[in-house]
């Protein structure tokens, strides 16, 4: 099936629910702010097919993004994202996308930026064992040890696991199950607490590439879904 639009949702936080058997299930809440289609990119012009999405935001918007919104006659403050698709059938400029784009019991892939943890040593960053706690080791218990060889090759190989910045990296978690779709609150309830990012951060949610895709089609623009400030 063709690749559908992926959406950018705000991470609200963690909680837990209980199923019919009384089993506790940890979940993560993702909120979809007002999202609509600003424009599209075609393979003939841009080299790939994509949908440019505007997501309502309360933070300050940079001038380049404001210019893009002005060209589309949009007065609302929106953050601009892009989602690649296989084809543009049924994509209409000005269509508002609902949280029902996803369905219950489907599987999704979530991409976000992990929490930054600053400069970390090799034991925390790469799970090194460390040196011995006694028997001659002095003030180097958490050291990484040797980093290379002798005169040949006389250098440290690229990609060597060493101390450095931990976190703040782009992470994708695959095959997360959608427990509930709350259309009234525009919430997506996802099983598990392993979605990357801090509270209030945006994550990219799309259909799981390793699981079956739901049969509902692309969102279709109707009169009641169009925003008033889009021409």
Curated annotation (Swiss-Prot):
Record has rRNA-binding as a keyword: yes
Residue(s) carrying N5-methylglutamine: 151
PTM (free text): Methylated by PrmB.
GO terms classed as biological process: translation
PROSITE patterns: RIBOSOMAL_L3
InterPro entries, sorted: Ribosomal_uL3 (IPR000597), Ribosomal_uL3_bac/org-type (IPR019927), Ribosomal_uL3_CS (IPR019926), Transl_B-barrel_sf (IPR009000)
UniProt keywords, alphabetically: Methylation, Ribonucleoprotein, Ribosomal protein, RNA-binding, rRNA-binding
Keyword Ribonucleoprotein: yes
GO molecular function: rRNA binding; structural constituent of ribosome
Membrane-crossing segments per the record: none
HAMAP family: Ribosomal_uL3_B (MF_01325_B)
Annotated function: One of the primary rRNA binding proteins, it binds directly near the 3'-end of the 23S rRNA, where it nucleates assembly of the 50S subunit.
Subunit structure: Part of the 50S ribosomal subunit. Forms a cluster with proteins L14 and L19.
Protein's name in the database: Large ribosomal subunit protein uL3
Organism field: Ehrlichia canis (strain Jake)
């Amino acid at each position: 099936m063709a690749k559908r639009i992926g959406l950018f949702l705000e991470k609200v936080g963690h909680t837990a629910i209980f199923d019919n058997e009384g089993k506790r299930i940890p979940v993560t809440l993702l909120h979809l702010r007002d999202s609509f289609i600003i424009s599209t990119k075609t393979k003939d012009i841009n080299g790939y097919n994509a949908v440019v999405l505007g997501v309502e935001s309360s933070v300050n918007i940079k001038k380049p993004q404001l210019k893009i919104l002005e060209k589309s006659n949009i007065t609302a403050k929106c953050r601009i994202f892009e989602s690649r698709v296989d084809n543009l059938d049924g994509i209409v400029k000005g269509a508002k996308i609902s949280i029902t784009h996803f369905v219950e019991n489907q599987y999704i892939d979530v991409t976000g930026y992990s929490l930054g943890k600053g400069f970390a040593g090799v034991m925390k960053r790469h799970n090194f064992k460390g040196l011995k706690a006694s028997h001659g080791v002095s003030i180097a218990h958490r050291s990484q040890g040797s980093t290379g060889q002798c005169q040949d090759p006389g250098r440290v190989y690229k990609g060597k696991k060493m101390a450095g910045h931990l976190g703040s990296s782009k992470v994708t978690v695959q095959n997360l199950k959608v427990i509930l779709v709350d259309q009234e609150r525009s919430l997506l309830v996802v099983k598990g607490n392993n979605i990357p990012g801090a509270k209030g951060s945006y994550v990219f949610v799309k259909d799981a590439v390793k699981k079956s895709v739901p049969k509902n089609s692309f969102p279709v623009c109707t009169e009641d879904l169009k925003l008033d400030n889009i021409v």
